[in-house]
């Protein structure tokens, strides 16, 4: 039909272009219908990895087709009129009739044989007297034989549809299993992240407590030295040889006082840094760890710890 825009090839048609030619060369006497069955069985036996390049090529052809024909809509051809005298298809619609007989699914992954029907129409145009729909095994004899052949063709189409539906079910089950495995892996990664972050928080809190204890012990030692100073004064009065040390004591007191102030400033600054780091880490965890948005008991525990540290 002139002016008719062909549908883009699906993955099976892309794959079968070369395979059909090879199979026809290896088996010159094999009929078109048998070749199509063999190709369908081989296509089903391919793995998803082996099919993926052909699906990608089919998607590319579909994109080019959409760009070339932006207003294209699929319109099935009208069924061909069969001559009452001979049962011969008219030349102009021969390929359309053959195509519609086995075009049982519009799914892009379904098996279609459009190229075969175009080839059959070409053969018919070369020899109109001998073309009797042999590629699809449509008999032109007794009506009972025609009904039997139609029932056989319908049964084949039903079997193909069942096989295709079963393949889709298996693929959906495989995809669901993969998604379930990915979700399980994600849950494990999230749990590992929680455990690692919790361990880091505990270690940092323990280190902070140790630093606080060391600072407290040092401050206590300084206070003890300050309380011992009156006793040292009494020893000075009892021992004249320590007179020079007594004169230097006010300067030492000032140094001790300055040192005590520096220690206090260091303690305050270090404590403020620890609180800020703890607060920043807690905010980072609350924003990134729990992607589901739920408030976990562990987050409540960290929030209470943060409040105690700040207060």
Swiss-Prot record:
Q: What is its main location?
A: nucleus
Q: Which InterPro entries does the record cross-reference, listed alphabetically?
A: HMG_box_dom, HMG_box_dom_sf, SRY-related_HMG-box_TF-like
Q: Where in the cell is it found?
A: Nucleus speckle; Cytoplasm; Nucleus
The terms describing its cellular component in GO are:
cytoplasm; nuclear speck
SMART domains from the entry? Answer: HMG (SM00398)
Biased composition range(s): Basic and acidic residues: 173-187, 236-261
UniProt region (Disordered), positions on chain: 135-279
UniProt PTM: Acetylation of Lys-81 contributes to its nuclear localization and enhances its interaction with KPNB1. Deacetylated by HDAC3.
Keywords for this protein: Acetylation, Activator, Calmodulin-binding, Cytoplasm, Differentiation, DNA-binding, Nucleus, Repeat, Sexual differentiation, Transcription, Transcription regulation
Q: Which residues fall under the DNA-binding region feature?
A: 5-73
Main function: Transcriptional regulator that controls a genetic switch in male development. It is necessary and sufficient for initiating male sex determination by directing the development of supporting cell precursors (pre-Sertoli cells) as Sertoli rather than granulosa cells. Involved in different aspects of gene regulation including promoter activation or repression. Binds to the DNA consensus sequence 5'-[AT]AACAA[AT]-3'. SRY HMG box recognizes DNA by partial intercalation in the minor groove and promotes DNA bending. Also involved in pre-mRNA splicing.
Q: What's said on domains?
A: The Gln- and His-rich domain may mediate protein-protein interactions.
Q: How does it assemble?
A: Interacts with CALM, EP300, HDAC3, KPNB1, ZNF208 isoform KRAB-O, PARP1, SLC9A3R2 and WT1. The interaction with EP300 modulates its DNA-binding activity. The interaction with KPNB1 is sensitive to dissociation by Ran in the GTP-bound form. Interaction with PARP1 impaired its DNA-binding activity.
The record, for PANTHER family, names:
SEX-DETERMINING REGION Y PROTEIN, SOX TRANSCRIPTION FACTOR
Question: What's the name of the protein?
Answer: Sex-determining region Y protein
Native organism is Mus spicilegus (Steppe mouse)
């Amino acid at each position: 039909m002139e002016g008719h825009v062909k549908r883009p090839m699906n993955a099976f048609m892309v794959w079968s272009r070369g395979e059909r030619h090879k199979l026809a060369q290896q088996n010159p006497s094999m009929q078109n219908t048998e070749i199509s069955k063999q190709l369908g069985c081989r296509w089903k036996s391919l793995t998803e990895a082996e099919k993926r390049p052909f699906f990608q090529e089919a998607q590319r052809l579909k994109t080019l087709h959409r760009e070339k024909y932006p207003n294209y809509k699929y319109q099935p051809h009208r069924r061909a009129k069969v001559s009452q005298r001979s049962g011969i298809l008219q030349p102009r619609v021969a390929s359309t009739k053959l195509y519609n007989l086995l075009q049982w699914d519009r799914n892009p992954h379904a098996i279609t044989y459009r190229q075969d029907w175009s080839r059959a129409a070409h053969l018919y145009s070369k020899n109109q007297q001998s073309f009797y729909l042999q590629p699809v095994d449509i008999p032109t004899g007794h009506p009972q034989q025609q009904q039997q052949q139609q029932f056989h063709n319908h049964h084949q189409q039903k079997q193909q549809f069942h096989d295709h539906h079963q393949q889709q079910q298996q693929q959906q089950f495989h995809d669901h299993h993969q998604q379930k495995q990915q979700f399980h892996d994600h849950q494990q990664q999230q749990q590992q992240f929680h455990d690692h972050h919790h361990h880091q928080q505990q270690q940092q809190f323990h280190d902070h407590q140790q630093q606080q204890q060391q600072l407290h012990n040092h401050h206590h030692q300084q206070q003890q030295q300050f309380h011992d100073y009156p006793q040292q004064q009494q020893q000075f009065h009892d021992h004249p040889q320590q007179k020079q040390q007594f004169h230097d004591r006010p300067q030492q007191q000032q140094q001790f006082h300055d040192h005590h102030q520096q220690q206090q400033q260091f303690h305050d600054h270090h404590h403020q840094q620890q609180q800020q780091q703890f607060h920043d880490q807690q905010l980072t965890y609350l924003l990134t760890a729990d992607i589901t948005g739920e408030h976990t008991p562990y987050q409540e525990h960290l929030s209470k710890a943060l409040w105690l540290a700040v207060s």
